[in-house]
Amino acid sequence: MEIKNWYELTFEIETNLEEIIIWKLNELGISSYAFEILLNNKNNKKVIIWLPHLNWPESLRIKLVRNIKEVLDKNNYQTNCFEWNLIEQEDWISSWKKYWGPEIVGDNLLILPCWLELPEEYKNKKVIKIDPGAAFGTGSHPTTSLCLEELEKISLSSKKILDIGSGSGILSIAARSFGASKIYSIDNDYLAINSTESNFRLNFGNLDNLKTYLGSFDGLVSKYTLKNFDFILCNILAEVIKGIIPDIRNCLKIDGEVILSGILNSQKDEIIKLLKASNLRINDVSSKKDWVCITAQKIP
């Protein structure tokens, strides 16, 4: 179904609340948003959220504002200034494009919006082209960049990869760019699956090394034979990760590794405890801002 119109919600927050708002939006399954620095008040930022018109009736929009206000109230910030606008597809495209530019991640990766030319100074970078569509993961958020930086460290040549919560497909594309031979991508949102396939084709011209599955990870594991993976990439909410760690272990080959992101610092210890309880050895823990990425390995 083609999205024709979008609701645009704007409000202001203190700059230090950006990460907690991102976490809340991710928890609510909202992935089209941006933050804008205010020139007249550099201690605050404007939050812009875009929502597909047909999926967000008034009752859900009221509930969304209530959820955001609760988060802000808990962090000692009060506002009642929430502004809604209904915008057409063309206006939405021009709105979010202005927040995009080339994004360097790690040592060698460049995330490039598909409508931009590759700048001359980045010719030596490994380029991942992205058409974000409804913006399911771009590389700019710490959870995604942490995963990409971990992928740079390891040898993926001829490896079999599972990407749980593929979103825009950015991690699947990076894995293939680093030499993975077969990528299996899972998401429970059909728009994300479409985005994964579209962006994979944009980068490689075909889908020969990609297989996609629409549905929840635990449901797909029981339906299909998803086993013997060298690496599993999982950039989703920690609350979801907690419930699927045993299934993740079962999908890995012996000595296979999982890269987990989407974890707040405050959630790290609990996730590590659950990984160890499932006989997954912690190999690496990295952090950026309030977020943590954990790499763990299946041991006999």
Swiss-Prot record:
Please tell me whether the keyword rRNA processing is annotated for this protein: no
Chief location bin: cytoplasm
- Kindly state which keywords UniProt assigns to this record, in alphabetical order: Cytoplasm, Methyltransferase, S-adenosyl-L-methionine, Transferase
Q: Does the keyword DNA repair apply?
A: no
Quote the catalytic activity from the record. L-lysyl-[protein] + 3 S-adenosyl-L-methionine = N(6),N(6),N(6)-trimethyl-L-lysyl-[protein] + 3 S-adenosyl-L-homocysteine + 3 H(+)
Q: For this UniProt entry, what's an example GO CC term?
A: cytoplasm
**Gene Ontology biological process:** methylation
**Residues engaged in binding S-adenosyl-L-methionine:** 144, 165, 187, 235
Kindly list the places in or outside the cell where this protein is found, as annotated in its UniProt entry: Cytoplasm
* EC number of this enzyme: 2.1.1.-
Superkingdom of the source species: Bacteria
Pfam families for this protein: PrmA (PF06325)
Q: Which Gene3D superfamilies match?
A: Vaccinia Virus protein VP39
Which family, according to the similarity comment?
Answer: Belongs to the methyltransferase superfamily. PrmA family.
Q: Which HAMAP family match?
A: Methyltr_PrmA
What does this gene product do? Methylates ribosomal protein L11.
This protein is called Ribosomal protein L11 methyltransferase
* Originating species: Prochlorococcus marinus subsp. pastoris (strain CCMP1986 / NIES-2087 / MED4)
Record gene name: prmA
